[in-house]
Amino acid sequence: MLALLKQFSEKRFVWFLLAFSSLALESTALYFQYGMGLQPCVLCVYERLAMIGLFVAGIIALLQPLAFILRLIALALGLFSSIKGLLISFRHLDLQMNPAPWKQCEFIPNFPETLPFHQWFPFIFNPTGSCNESQWSLFGLTMVQWLVVIFSLYVVILTLLLIAQVIKTRKQRRLFN
């Protein structure tokens, strides 16, 4: 199975799927903000940045999927982004499920001074909403719960792909070849 996953990771389609799915989710977030009028909070902005990290990881490996080092860089960036996104989503879910006056998120994103994304790209990274509000749901799950599911899937898939890259597998012996 690991050999199959390694072969699978050497195909451009896999990395295109990663880049396309994260771009589609980012586009959906922008539609929710500008099309439906839902206001993003600080944690939503951080989750968006994690999604953009997944997009960049997909683009890196899409350049040359047969290059081992590019695959490893893409997997490391993708796994870091998906784990970070999952942790932020868990924190966001805790704020929504267990609201309390002392549990609030900040109003201004805490980006490094050298990378003030909220000033460079305010149409994507400028938070205007509250983290405690649940504004949308689908099939009984809120947007944050969907993000927990999505980031969990990314973590599992990228972890399996990373394991397939580093663990040596025995070649299959064929009897009739």
UniProtKB/Swiss-Prot annotation:
Membrane topology (UniProt): Multi-pass membrane protein
A biological process from GO: protein folding
GO molecular function, one term: electron transfer activity
Pfam families per the UniProt record, alphabetical: DsbB (PF02600)
Topological region Cytoplasmic: 1-14, 66-72, 165-177
Main location: membrane
GO cellular component: plasma membrane
Domain of life, per lineage: Bacteria
Protein family: Belongs to the DsbB family.
Task performed by this protein: Required for disulfide bond formation in some periplasmic proteins. Acts by oxidizing the DsbA protein.
Protein name: Disulfide bond formation protein B
Protein's organism: Haemophilus influenzae (strain 86-028NP)
